[in-house]
Amino acid sequence: MADAAATAGAAGSGTRSGSKQSTNPADNYHLARRRTLQVVVSSLLTEAGFESAEKASVETLTEMLQSYISEIGRSAKSYCEHTARTQPTLSDIVVTLVEMGFNVDTLPAYAKRSQRMVITAPPVTNQPVTPKALTAGQNRPHPPHIPSHFPEFPDPHTYIKTPTYREPVSDYQVLREKAASQRRDVERALTRFMAKTGETQSLFKDDVSTFPLIAARPFTIPYLTALLPSELEMQQMEETDSSEQDEQTDTENLPLHISPDDSGAEKENTSVLQQNPSLSGSRNGEESIIDNPYLRPVKKPKIRRKKSLS
């Protein structure tokens, strides 16, 4: 029967194309074409009176039919291109059949035969359309230079991008290691810069550039550091100055109790200074001239006394 032959042909094509069906559209097209040829071969065998056929026989006849049709198409295309045309016509196919030794006059009688079997078209199964869960905007149409059979552009939501940022590292150990490596890199870069720009010394006499060392520069005036005040002395001087200012503010805030004897002594001092203005000028001059801290008179630290509530 034709159904048995078609089943055998379909099974043979399955073994030929592979046990698993491919999801590639090109592979699906070749598989569908192969099955169509097997159905045609099965119908021809049924018309010839065969009830069943072996798998190898169906495959051989399918290959012969496919080769015959391919040769007709190739020859028709070559005749078409020979006459400076791009698409073959019926005359090209007729010339091809004549060149292949086929009698074209027998085609109408063969098409009108009484035992001809009508092959129905295979059912077209449309793939289920999955609803789009997310739609943002409208799809872009194809530009004029892109053919319409090409796939459509992706949905607009696929072009949406969200920039990502790396979270800052908050681990204490990692931060310490990173700070130590940065400090080490800075020190190495600084020493290399000093070695390239300044004078260097080498541990090896033969090769000077192998292990350069920064040359030690002696001070031009070595005793200058002994004459300059240190940080401790400057801090002590600032503390004494601040204590004097505090005492001065305390004396300004306290009520003045001046005895008559003290007032008389102050009047005498002011009268002496008025008679000899050179004394006050010399004192002010000495204080302004003496700028070296080692030549200044020694100042004992004053003890701050707490105010008594009376």
Swiss-Prot record:
The modification Phosphoserine is found at residue 271. Belongs to the TAF8 family. GO terms for biological process: cell differentiation; transcription initiation at RNA polymerase II promoter. The modification Phosphothreonine is found at residue 130. It is found in: Nucleus; Cytoplasm. SMART domains: BTP. Pfam families: Bromo_TP, TAF8_C. This is Transcription initiation factor TFIID subunit 8. It comes from Bos taurus (Bovine). Transmembrane segments: none annotated. Component of the TFIID basal transcription factor complex, composed of TATA-box-binding protein TBP, and a number of TBP-associated factors (TAFs), including TAF1, TAF2, TAF3, TAF4, TAF5, TAF6, TAF7, TAF8, TAF9, TAF10, TAF11, TAF12 and TAF13. Interacts with TBP, TAF1, TAF6, TAF10, TAF11 and TAF13. Component also of a small TAF complex (SMAT) containing TAF8, TAF10 and SUPT7L. Forms a heterodimer with TAF10. Interaction with TAF10 is mediated mainly via its histone fold domain while interaction with SUPT7L is via its C-terminal region. Residues 270-283 have a biased composition (Polar residues). GO terms for cellular component: cytoplasm; transcription factor TFIID complex. Keywords: Acetylation, Cytoplasm, Developmental protein, Differentiation, Nucleus, Phosphoprotein, Transcription, Transcription regulation. GO terms for molecular function: protein heterodimerization activity. The modification N-acetylalanine is found at residue 2. CDD domains: HFD_TAF8, TAF8. The keyword Transcription regulation applies. A motif (Nuclear localization signal) lies at residues 294-307. Residues 236-250 have a biased composition (Acidic residues). Residues 297-310 have a biased composition (Basic residues). Residues 1-19 have a biased composition (Low complexity).
